[in-house]
UniProtKB/Swiss-Prot annotation:
The keyword Protein transport does not apply. It is found in: Cell membrane. It is a multi-pass membrane protein. The chain crosses the membrane at residues 9-29, 36-56, 76-96, 103-123, 135-155, 162-182, 199-219, 236-256, 288-308, 319-339, 366-386. InterPro entries: Polysacc_synth (IPR002797), PolySynth_Transporter (IPR052556). One of its GO terms (cellular component) is plasma membrane. This is Uncharacterized membrane protein HI_0867. Keywords: Cell membrane, Membrane, Transmembrane, Transmembrane helix. PANTHER family: LOCUS PUTATIVE PROTEIN 1-RELATED. Belongs to the polysaccharide synthase family. HI_0867/HI_1700 subfamily.
Length: 404
């Protein structure tokens, strides 16, 4: 019962944290306009890149250390990771200052505190503190939204910069608050230089490999950078808004997947669900894939414009295409969960890299056509990996039978 209760709390927190930014969309679309939303999307693309190199997946390193070695010297890893983040982040801030890029300065500073915050969330999750974890997560989202509204109502110019500044202040406030609470509860044991050195190499060895994994997620945001430099901010605004709205479906798909995976793994362990069942379900789910796009197709665009503002004429097309690529996650999850069950991380990484390569190949060709064709790069990337996953899962099943 405790497991179900904690899972429910995590799920509620996850959905609540994801819902608030979507509820903010109509406000942002009206305040920033199409061009402003496009510019904001362009700058926000750099935030995950900065987090990758400044953070080196410290949240994952902390979680692994806790489960493998326990919590006795967990603070050593936390403090060493924070020192690394401040050092690399400091260099990034110095570079932005020399280049006189105020917005990039804010983004690097925001990335530093986002790393701090993700580590604090990881600690709470490891220690099964579901309510504090959810409280921090929801507080961060609500503070972010409240500060955004406050800044955009108070100022009339440079609104994109003010939105980024609101994100920064929110990250700083919640990260510092959660760290102060953590400091009060942790034993401030003294560590020696050699121990810090060992912890540093642990973080580097773990995080360096994860750069490639997380880098594939960033690469899928490159379309926004290309569009910003090749087309207009207004076209990027429509494109980014379409992707943002379609992402709502992704949140629900991943939330349902997160809830069902424990039951799926249990059925696989019992043998009541086999790979042939997953293959059949994956194939049948292809019938579901076009449904969200078809439903959106019959929705009058006036309804969307009422929601987003009259300047977003044409956004419906992008929502339809991005919903198609997002829906392709359903057959993908049926297959990739089988690999997760058998711990085939190399095969999963290979599929991620291959899907990214298909996406980049398609993007490289479509970027020289028209902006309306660029979303199909995501569709091709999601669709192209399915036959490969089918063959890999089949091979994994054969190897499992051979070893048993």
């Amino acid at each position: 019962m405790s497991l179900i209760k904690d899972s429910s709390i995590y799920l509620i927190g996850e959905l609540s944290a994801k819902c608030v930014p979507f509820l903010l969309l109509p406000y942002l679309s009206r305040k920033l306009g199409v061009e402003g939303f496009g510019e904001l999307s362009y700058y926000q693309t750099f935030l995950p890149l900065f987090v990758i190199f400044i953070g080196l997946s410290q949240d994952g390193a902390v979680a692994r250390y806790f489960y493998v070695y326990g919590k006795r010297s967990l603070n050593l890893v936390v403090k060493t990771g924070y020192a690394y983040t401040l050092s690399i982040g400091g260099l990034g801030l110095l570079f932005c200052w020399l280049m006189q890029s105020e917005i990039m300065f804010y983004l690097v500073l925001s990335a530093i505190f986002q790393v701090f915050l993700s580590v604090q969330l990881s600690i709470r999750q490891c220690q099964k503190q579901a309510i504090p974890y959810t409280f921090i997560q929801v507080s961060s989202t609500i503070t972010n939204a409240a500060l955004t509204i406050l800044m955009l109502e108070f100022y009339q110019t440079d609104l994109v910069e003010k939105r980024i500044l609101a994100i920064l202040i929110s990250n700083v406030f919640v990260a510092l608050l959660s760290y102060l609470i953590y400091r009060k509860r942790v034993n401030n044991k003294k560590f020696y230089f050699l121990q810090y050195k060992t912890a540093f190499f642990y973080i580097m060895s773990f995080g360096f490999l994860m750069i490639f994994h997380h880098g594939s997620f960033f690469i899928r945001q490159l379309d926004r950078i290309f569009i910003f430099h090749r087309f207009s901010e207004a076209e990027l605004g429509l494109y980014a808004m379409g992707a943002q709205i379609a992402f709502i479906l992704s949140v629900f798909i991943l939330a349902i997947n997160k809830a069902l995976v424990p039951y799926l793994f249990e059925k696989l362990k019992q043998g009541s669900v086999k790979l042939k069942d997953l293959h059949r379900w994956s194939l049948l789910s292809l019938l579901i894939v076009p449904i969200p796009s078809l439903v959106t197709l019959i929705v009058p665009e006036q309804w969307l414009l009422f929601f987003l503002g009259k300047h977003f004429i044409g956004v419906k097309y992008y929502i339809i295409v991005f919903l198609l690529s997002t829906s392709l996650t359903i057959p993908y999850l049926f297959l990739v969960n089988y690999l997760f069950y058998h711990g085939k991380t190399k095969e999963i990484s290979f599929c991620s890299v291959l899907s990214t390569m298909i996406y980049l190949g398609a993007l490289g060709g479509l970027i020289f056509t028209d902006v309306v064709y660029i979303p199909y790069a995501s569709v091709l990337g999601a669709l192209g990996i399915l036959p490969v996953l089918y063959k890999i899962t089949k091979r994994v099943e054969e190897n499992e039978y051979a070893t048993h």
